[in-house]
Amino acid sequence: MPYCERCFDEFEDEIEEYGYKPTPIFYGNGKRYFGVELEVDEGGKDNDNAAALKSIANVHEENIYIKSDGSLEDGFEIVSHPMTLEYHTEEMNWKEILREAVAMGYRSHQTSTCGLHIHVNRNAFGDNQAEQEDVISRILFFVEKHWNELFTFSRRSSYNMSRW
């Protein structure tokens, strides 16, 4: 739908571009921070839906933002700022966000297009670079050793896994 110049200038796109990466805001107190990227699909790449989900999550703080994702057919990615596990479970209103997303027609687990990505800050792995590198190498060893089980757990096809 075309907009007049004034409306176009006032229009706020609630869905950021794929490459959007704001300055992280860390929530909670602790050593480990987790950022969540939840892909949802089948409900539309819709500004009003994105705004509604953000209004649930961002009542007091900017906890989430929403991004485009080219791997999705008709949805977007809900991205949290880094938070401690306690903040995610006690302060973030994930249950209401997800309930509303489902009510809007979004799906995640029940699709072949969506994924859940958890980012962890490097300092969670140790107090210095040597400790961090040691833990990261053990994680890589675990992934290599248990690749077949992780592949099954991921629910990805061989084609999708090769793209990853």
Regions found by a protein language model. Name each.
Residues 75, 109-125:
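Histidine-centered divalent-metal-coordination microenvironment in nucleic-acid enzymes
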Residues 84, 124, 149:
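Short loop/turn segments at secondary-structure transitions that flank enzyme active sites
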Residues 2-105:
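Terminal catalytic/cofactor-binding subdomain
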